[in-house]
A protein has these predicted regions:
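Structured, non-catalytic alpha/beta "coupling" segments that mediate domain-domain communication
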Residues: 47, 56-64, 305, 404, ...
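Glycine-rich, charged/polar anion/phosphate-binding loops
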Residues: 114, 154-155, 167-168, 178-181, ...
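Catalytic cores of soluble metabolic enzymes centered on carboxylation/carboxyl-transfer
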Residues: 267-503
Length: 567
C-alpha cells in the first residue's frame, strides 16, 4: 500500500499489486487505520506487517487488524500498550528484576511537583515523555535557572507530539553507551536473544551508526544484559521481534525502553548471526514458532551500518528534498535502499536514502571498509550526510570506542567542518589527465559514455596518442579556473602536468575497471572513482568528492571537428 506521494516509489514499482490509501501527508494515508485495513481486505490479505514506523507500535491498529480477522505481525496489543508508555515499561522491567535508572516513580504532569522532585534529585536530570520513543521526547535539565522553562517546554512537547503530558524524571548518565538486545519470541513464553547491538553514536538521541556486537565491553556484562532482556520478554510472553534497550555506564547497565518492532538497524544482527530476521518474523506470525534455541546462535565477525540521509549538516541537518539526479552507491557490501537515481526525496517522510552495511572478520576491518565505501558514494540533487558519516568512520576516538551517547553533540562543529584539501594540485592534475585521455579515445569504448554522459556529442578526433602539451582549462566548485598542460611521458601510462604557476607533476594513471582508476605519484598510489557527466568531471577521492568543469581550447580542434562540436 502507498500514499499518493509514493505512487512512483521504488517499493511500488517492484511490487505486483498495490493500493493507494490517501494523500502524501502521513496523517492522511499511512496513519489512517481504516484505510490500511480496507486496503488489506481489498486484496484478500490474511496478515499485515507494520514495518518500522507509522502504526508499527500502535495497539489500536493491532486490535483493528485482529478484529478484521487478519494477523498482526508483531506483539499483542497488550504488549504494545505496556511498552508504548515509558512509565509502564519501566514498571515491567522492575517486576522482571531488570535494573532501571533511578528517579521519581511513575509519570508526573504537575509542573510544580516536577520542579520540586528535580531539585531533590539534583541536576542533571532527564525529562522523558511517557509516550516518546526512538530518541524523541527527551529534554536534559542542567541549569536550575532554566528549570521552569525546561519543564514547561517538555510538557508542551509531550502533549503536542505524543498526546500525553506525562513525564518521567530520571537521573542523567552523562557518558553512557547505548547497548540494545535483539529478542525474538513465539508468544508462548519461548524467547531467545540474537545478541546485542551498539548504537552509541547518536545525534540528539537519533542513531547515526550502529554495529554488532558491542565492542570493548566485557562479554560477561553483555551476557547479563542479554539474559535480562530475555527474562523481560518471557514475563510478557513476547511475540515477534523486539529490541530491549539499555544504557551502560561505569560497569553497570540500566533498562531504557523496549521497541516492540523490527528495527532499522536489524541488518547488522542478520550479518553476525546469519539469520533472516524478516523471514523469522513471518515464521512467528504463521504460528510456526522460532525454529531455533539459544544454543543454535553464535556471533560471526563484526558488522557496521551507516544511515545515509538526504539532510544538510550545514543547516543543522535539515532534511533536503529534491530529485536524485545522481545516485551511485558502492559495491562489495550490503545496500538497503528505497530509492533509485531519478527518484524524488519528498518532504513527507523520513529522508533516508540508503543503509550501508559492512560485515567483516573484525571491527577494525569493518570500519575501514565502511569508510572506503562512503568515499565512493555519489549523490546529486540533494544534500547528504555522507561527509559527516565518513568523518565518524575514520575518527580515532570512535575507533577506540572512547565515545558516549552525547559525544557527537559535543563535537558537531569538528565533525561537520568541510576538510581542506591537502593536495588540490594532485586532484586537478588527475582530472586533467582523465579528461584529455577520455576525450581523445574512441567514445564507443569509453565506459563513461555507457552512463549516457555524452548523448549527442562526438568526442575526440581518433587515435590513441595525446599531442604533446595538450591544454585543458579546469574550473573547480569555487569557480576558480586554471589552465593545465598535459604531456605524455609514456602514452597511456605516465604523464607530466604543467600548471600555470610553472609547477609540474609526473603522474601515472590507469583504468582498472570502468570508472575505477589507479593514480600514482612516485611510490604513492591512490584509487579513485571518476566519470564525465553532464559536462563535468566528478572525482571520488580519499579527500572527498570533487567536481571540475573542463574546457579544451578550440585551437586543438580542426575545422571539420569544430563544426561537428567535437572537443
Amino acid at each position: 500500500m502507498h500514499s499518493q506521494a509514493d505512487a512512483n516509489a521504488l517499493h511500488v514499482r517492484e511490487i505486483g499489486k498495490s493500493v493507494c490509501i490517501g494523500a502524501g501527508p502521513a496523517s492522511e494515508s499511512y496513519l489512517k487505520i481504516d484505510a490500511v485495513i480496507a486496503a488489506a481486505q481489498s486484496v484478500g490479505a490474511d496478515a499485515i506487517h507494520p514495518g518500522y514506523g507509522f502504526l508499527a507500535e500502535n495497539p489500536d491498529f493491532a486490535r483493528a487488524v485482529e478484529a478484521a480477522g487478519m494477523i498482526f505481525m508483531g506483539p499483542t496489543p497488550e504488549t504494545l500498550e505496556r511498552f508504548g508508555d515509558k512509565a509502564s515499561a519501566k514498571e515491567a522491567a522492575v517486576a522482571a528484576s531488570v535494573p532501571v535508572i533511578s528517579g521519581a516513580e511513575g509519570a508526573r504532569s504537575d509542573p510544580e511537583q516536577i520542579a520540586e522532585e528535580v531539585r531533590q534529585m539534583g541536576l542533571p536530570v532527564l525529562l522523558k515523555a511517557v509516550g516518546g520513543g526512538g530518541g524523541r521526547g527527551q529534554r536534559l535539565v542542567t541549569d536550575e535557572t532554566t528549570l521552569v522553562e525546561d519543564i514547561e517546554g517538555a510538557l508542551r512537547e509531550a502533549k503536542s507530539t505524543f498526546g500525553s503530558e506525562g513525564l518521567l524524571l530520571e537521573r542523567f548518565l552523562p557518558e553512557a553507551r547505548h547497548v540494545e538486545v535483539q529478542i525474538a519470541g513465539d508468544g508462548k513464553g519461548h524467547v531467545v536473544h540474537l545478541f546485542e547491538r551498539d548504537c552509541t553514536l547518536q545525534r540528539r538521541h537519533q542513531k547515526v551508526i550502529e554495529e554488532a556486537p558491542a565492542w570493548g565491553l566485557p562479554r560477561t556484562l553483555l551476557d547479563d544484559i542479554a539474559r535480562d532482556a530475555v527474562r523481560l520478554g518471557e514475563t510478557l510472553d513476547y511475540r515477534g521481534l523486539g529490541t530491549v534497550e539499555f544504557l551502560v555506564a561505569g560497569g553497570e547497565y540500566f533498562f531504557l525502553e523496549v521497541n516492540p518492532r523490527i528495527q532499522v538497524e536489524h541488518p547488522v544482527t542478520e550479518a553476525i548471526t546469519g539469520l533472516d530476521l524478516v523471514a523469522l518474523h513471518l515464521r512467528i506470525a504463521e504460528g510456526a514458532g522460532l525454529g531455533l534455541v539459544q544454543d543454535d546462535l553464535t556471533i560471526n565477525g563484526h558488522a557496521v551500518e551507516a544511515r545515509l540521509y538526504a539532510e544538510d549538516p550545514a543547516m543543522q541537518f535539515a532534511p533536503s528534498t529534491g530529485t536524485l539526479s545522481t545516485l551511485s552507491l558502492p559495491s562489495g557490501l550490503r545496500i538497503d535502499s528505497g530509492v533509485e537515481e531519478g527518484d524524488a526525496v519528498t518532504p513527507y517522510y523520513d529522508p533516508m536514502i540508503a543503509k550501508l552495511i559492512v560485515h567483516a572478520p573484525d571491527r577494525e576491518t569493518a570500519l575501514a571498509r565502511l569508510a572506503t565505501a562512503l568515499d565512493h558514494v555519489a549523490v546529486e540533487g540533494v544534500e547528504t550526510n555522507r561527509a559527516f558519516l565518513t568523518a565518524l568512520a575514520r575518527n580515532h576516538e570512535f575507533e577506540r570506542m572512547q565515545v558516549h551517547t552525547r559525544w557527537i553533540d559535543g563535537r558537531l562543529d569538528e565533525l561537520t567542518q568541510a576538510p581542506g584539501l591537502t593536495r588540490p594540485d594532485l586532484w586537478k592534475a588527475t582530472a586533467a589527465i582523465l579528461f584529455v585521455t577520455q576525450s581523445r579515445s574512441d567514445t564507443n569504448a569509453n565506459p563513461w559514455t555507457n552512463r549516457d554522459a555524452f548523448t549527442g556529442w562526438r568526442l575526440g578526433l581518433g587515435g590513441d596518442a595525446i599531442e604533446a602539451g595538450q591544454r585543458v582549462t579546469l574550473t573547480d566548485s569555487d569557480e576558480v579556473s586554471e589552465e593545465l598542460r598535459v604531456s605524455p611521458v609514456k602514452p597511456g601510462a605516465k604523464y607530466t602536468i604543467h600548471s600555470e604557476k610553472g609547477e609540474a607533476l609526473i603522474l601515472s594513471a590507469r583504468e582498472l575497471t570502468p570508472g575505477r582508476w589507479r593514480v600514482g605519484e612516485g611510490d604513492t598510489v591512490h584509487l579513485i572513482d571518476a566519470r564525465l557527466h553532464a559536462g563535468v568531471i566528478e572525482l571520488d577521492t580519499p579527500e572527498g568528492r570533487l567536481v571540475f568543469r573542463p574546457a579544451a581550447p578550440l585551437a586543438f580542434v580542426g575545422g571539420d571537428a569544430a563544426a561537428d562540436r567535437a572537443v
